[in-house]
């Protein structure tokens, strides 16, 4: 399980 929160795609 990977918890990745990208700051792009706003």
UniProtKB/Swiss-Prot annotation:
<keyword id="KW-0286">Flight</keyword>
<dbReference type="GO" id="GO:0007218">
    <property type="term" value="P:neuropeptide signaling pathway"/>
</dbReference>
<keyword id="KW-0527">Neuropeptide</keyword>
<comment type="function">
    <text>Hypertrehalosaemic factors are neuropeptides that elevate the level of trehalose in the hemolymph (trehalose is the major carbohydrate in the hemolymph of insects).</text>
</comment>
<dbReference type="GO" id="GO:0005179">
    <property type="term" value="F:hormone activity"/>
</dbReference>
<dbReference type="GO" id="GO:0005576">
    <property type="term" value="C:extracellular region"/>
</dbReference>
<keyword id="KW-0873">Pyrrolidone carboxylic acid</keyword>
<dbReference type="GO" id="GO:0007629">
    <property type="term" value="P:flight behavior"/>
</dbReference>
<keyword id="KW-0027">Amidation</keyword>
<dbReference type="InterPro" id="IPR002047">
    <property type="entry name" value="Adipokinetic_hormone_CS"/>
</dbReference>
<keyword id="KW-0964">Secreted</keyword>
<keyword id="KW-0372">Hormone</keyword>
<comment type="similarity">
    <text>Belongs to the AKH/HRTH/RPCH family.</text>
</comment>
<protein>
    <recommendedName>
        <fullName>RO-1</fullName>
    </recommendedName>
</protein>
<feature type="modified residue" description="Threonine amide">
    <location>
        <position position="10"/>
    </location>
</feature>
<feature type="modified residue" description="Pyrrolidone carboxylic acid">
    <location>
        <position position="1"/>
    </location>
</feature>
């Amino acid at each position: 399980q990977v918890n990745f929160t990208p700051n792009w795609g706003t």
